[in-house]
Amino acid sequence: MPVSPKQARTLKHQLWVAFLVVPPIVFMSLFVVYPILSAFAYAFYDWQGLARGEFVGLKNFKEVLFGATMAPVVWNAFLHNVYALIALMIIQNGGGFFLAWLLYKEPFGFRFHRVAVFVPVVLSTIIVGFLWKLFLNPNFGIINQALYSVGLDALAKPWLGDSSTALGALILANAWHFVGFPALVYLAGMQRIPLEIIEAARLDGTNEWQLLRNIVWPLVAPSTTILFTLLFIGAFNWFEIPYVMVGLDGSPFGSTDVLGLVFYRTAFGNQSASIQNFGMGSALATLLFLFIVVFASMLTLWLRRREIQF
């Protein structure tokens, strides 16, 4: 049966679409969907990585949540993830908002500053981790040297070796690394605000703080929704910065332990615990995945209800 030119064009278009769509679907299925489903399955087995052991049902989940050995480590790490989330919401996203406002007002050289703010974001997280590890070195790090130079010797300390400052140091390094991203997202949101609204508020005698709090902040709510959701996901997937700066053990004395490190140690072992337990590691990963999906969805819905359309 002869094919009309229109049918031929339609067929060609469909083949081209299939050519573009099928490879990514296959790639995602092999390297994303299959590993996730496999992790769900492994969580129900006593599996050490070589040969699948016996089916243990919910035993791995119970051990992760309530076990005498595993649960205290998991809950300690979970609290550190929560602390990181709260601190990064204030420092990283809050700092990004104020940086965006400064850039929005287009100060002298603002194009250079806009690029400079974003440069740390494109750096490798491994490089950033090593860089801040050098900055915080107690002997020759730039932080302590700066304190010595201004006579504040009493404030100098081993930042990564002190339980009271180690987690804060990691949070600071992470905020420096990524603050440029929320800054540019908020800047894009601010540039969408009609100038008439800003000018009318200024004519009414609104000061800078009132303008930010009552006008700008509510109108960039869509940007806030995106950034808080991404930060929530990132905070509970936190791994690279702690791993590079303090190692797998969450030193000192577990004060920097986070769920990503606990998962890695459990599934793959480390220097002090070489036993691998993929089953329990998969159970932890499954619980973390479900927690992130559920609460990130709830957070997104709650924030979207607070958005203002203009």
Residue ranges of each PLM-predicted region?
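Short, Lys/Arg-rich, polar N-terminal cytosolic tail immediately upstream
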Residues: M1-L11
